[in-house]
């Protein structure tokens, strides 16, 4: 080897060590790291492959979700790599889960584009979930720094303004989803809307998969639905509404549908989670500019949020959607037909509604969070609930929620209007009992029976659904306390 080659080789080796080096030795593991107020923090539940050290697995997650690749590259020397490397700083074993660990990772704020959920998620969940070194991986929680949150608009309207527009205070908002989801003509669809609103509901809504199919194009549905809204408002003297689903194949189509809804006098439009983060943020910006309420159906979330070992906890989706700017999001019922452990659901609701939250491990909240004055995002409870559960719903979910009774309204034997009346009476009698200081939780069934003595539709509903419960064990439960799912 010539002297010149030897010199170049020596200089190169002094500048950086080439080849494949463990991530922990490359600077992605730092147990002494001092967390900055501006850091984005993420907590992963990680099950490493057999033989993989959990610290190395955590460092690999930090590396592959920030600056690293599988081998050392000389272009690291051209960047402020010590700054831009994510730092895994803590690894804890998961209680009652062998060979599974909580991995805490800190990301410098400059790794992310301001106000871009797509960019944030491209790093945090973009690549590492297919990493061979881990058998399973789940994003459990995140802390968003104040400085980052100030680059997001948050909910366009917020709960307080929505209550003022509806003139509804001191109780949950009451609604229903039109059933059947698919197949109705526009005229019959509008009839369902009118009957439900006339019976006492505040809103009705489209379901996630009703868009603009051959049996009913969106214009027809929007026209007949708003006719029902206006008629019911005139008859009842109350402010009414209907969540018109503007979900479509392209942004151009969604804007067109949302504008049509606005032109018809609607105060709210709806989108589905499956349209993607960029589309959600785009629609949220449109909603704020046009002074519209934006409802989000979480369609598709359980494909990655339900299983405890792999995917993403729904509380992270709640945080991202509050940042993105939606006003409503479906967040669970506890007692309904869909997945929902009581403590986990409480954590979701607190994430959406509180301006500041502390660490609460039983609820799955691993980080304290200051929401930088972003408005509240209203949780929606929907799926398999009925008026006989009203005391449980108010106990678990409180007032700041939209209760959606689909089958529990439209399945009433005496018709849609009767179903709506049963739900309205059940809600109001339970709120009155609570406000009077009664033990409405234990006395709930009797409170409902007493109200039903003067409300035939409520009595019919209680007789029909009195034995309907969904007592299945939740798959996503707290790691730090036993929380059996039961409808008591």
From Swiss-Prot:
It comes from the Eukaryota. The active site is at 179 (proton acceptor), 297 (proton acceptor). Substrate binds at residues 127, 177, 181, 298, 330, 382. Mg(2+) binds at residues 205, 207-208. Its cofactor is Mg(2+). The modification N6-carboxylysine is found at residue 205. GO terms for cellular component: chloroplast. One of its GO terms (molecular function) is magnesium ion binding. InterPro entries: RuBisCO (IPR033966), RuBisCo_large_chain_AS (IPR020878), RuBisCO_lsu_C (IPR000685), RuBisCO_lsu_C_sf (IPR036376), RuBisCO_lsu_fd_N (IPR017443), RuBisCO_lsu_N_sf (IPR036422), RuBisCO_lsuI (IPR020888). SUPFAM superfamilies: RuBisCo, C-terminal domain, RuBisCO, large subunit, small (N-terminal) domain. It is found in: Plastid, Chloroplast. GO terms for biological process: reductive pentose-phosphate cycle. Its EC number is 4.1.1.39. Keywords: Calvin cycle, Carbon dioxide fixation, Chloroplast, Lyase, Magnesium, Metal-binding, Monooxygenase, Oxidoreductase, Photorespiration, Photosynthesis, Plastid. Binds 1 Mg(2+) ion per subunit. The record marks 337 as: Transition state stabilizer. It catalyses: 2 (2R)-3-phosphoglycerate + 2 H(+) = D-ribulose 1,5-bisphosphate + CO2 + H2O; D-ribulose 1,5-bisphosphate + O2 = 2-phosphoglycolate + (2R)-3-phosphoglycerate + 2 H(+). PROSITE patterns: RUBISCO_LARGE. Heterohexadecamer of 8 large chains and 8 small chains. RuBisCO catalyzes two reactions: the carboxylation of D-ribulose 1,5-bisphosphate, the primary event in carbon dioxide fixation, as well as the oxidative fragmentation of the pentose substrate in the photorespiration process. Both reactions occur simultaneously and in competition at the same active site. The basic functional RuBisCO is composed of a large chain homodimer in a 'head-to-tail' conformation. In form I RuBisCO this homodimer is arranged in a barrel-like tetramer with the small subunits forming a tetrameric 'cap' on each end of the 'barrel'. Belongs to the RuBisCO large chain family. Type I subfamily. This is Ribulose bisphosphate carboxylase large chain. It comes from Chrysotila carterae.
């Amino acid at each position: 080897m010539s002297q010149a080659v030897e010199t170049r080789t020596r200089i190169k080796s002094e500048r950086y060590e080439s080849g494949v080096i463990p991530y922990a030795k490359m600077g992605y593991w730092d147990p002494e790291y001092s967390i900055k107020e501006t850091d984005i923090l993420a907590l992963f539940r990680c099950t490493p492959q057999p033989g993989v050290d959990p610290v190395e697995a955590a460092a690999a997650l930090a590396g592959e979700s920030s600056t690293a690749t599988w081998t050392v590259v000389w272009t690291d020397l051209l960047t402020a790599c010590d700054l831009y490397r994510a730092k895994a700083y803590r690894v804890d074993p998961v209680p009652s889960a062998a060979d599974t660990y909580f991995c805490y990772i800190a990301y410098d704020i400059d790794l992310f584009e301001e106000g871009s959920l797509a960019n944030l998620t491209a790093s945090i969940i973009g690549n590492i979930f297919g990493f061979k070194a881990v058998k399973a991986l789940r994003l459990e929680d995140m802390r968003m720094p104040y400085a980052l949150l100030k680059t997001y608009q948050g909910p366009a309207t917020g709960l307080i303004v929505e209550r003022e527009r509806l003139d509804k205070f001191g109780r949950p908002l009451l609604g229903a989803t039109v059933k059947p989801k698919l197949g109705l003509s526009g005229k019959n669809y509008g009839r369902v809307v009118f009957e439900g609103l006339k019976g006492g509901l505040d809103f009705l809504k489209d379901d996630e998969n009703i868009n603009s199919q051959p049996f009913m194009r969106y214009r027809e549905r929007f026209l007949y639905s708003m006719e029902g809204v206006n008629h019911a408002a005139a008859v009842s003297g109350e402010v009414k509404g209907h969540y018109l689903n503007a979900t479509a194949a392209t942004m151009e189509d969604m804007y067109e549908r949302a504008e049509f809804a606005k032109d018809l006098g609607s105060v709210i439009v709806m989108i589905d989670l499956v349209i993607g983060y960029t589309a959600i943020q785009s629609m949220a910006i449109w909603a704020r500019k046009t002074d519209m309420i934006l409802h989000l159906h979480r369609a598709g979330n359980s494909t990655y949020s339900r299983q405890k070992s792999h995917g993403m906890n729904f509380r992270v989706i709640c945080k991202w959607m509050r940042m993105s700017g939606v006003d409503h999001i479906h967040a669970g019922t506890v007692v309904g037909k869909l997945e929902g452990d009581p403590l986990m659901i409480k954590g979701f609701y607190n994430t959406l509604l509180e301006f500041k939250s502390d660490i609460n491990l039983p609820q799955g909240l691993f980080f304290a969070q200051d929401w930088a004055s972003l408005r509240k995002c209203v949780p929606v409870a929907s799926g398999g609930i009925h008026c006989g559960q009203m005391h449980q719903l108010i106990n678990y979910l409180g007032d700041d929620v939209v209760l959606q009774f689909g089958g529990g309204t439209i399945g009433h034997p005496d018709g849609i209007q009767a179903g709506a009346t049963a739900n309205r009476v059940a809600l109001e009698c339970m709120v009155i009992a609570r406000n009077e200081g009664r033990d409405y939780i234990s006395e709930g069934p009797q409170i409902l029976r007493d109200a039903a003595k003067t409300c035939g539709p409520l009595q019919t509903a209680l007789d029909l659904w009195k034995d309907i419960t969904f007592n299945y064990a939740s798959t996503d439960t707290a790691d730090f306390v036993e929380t059996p799912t039961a409808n008591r």
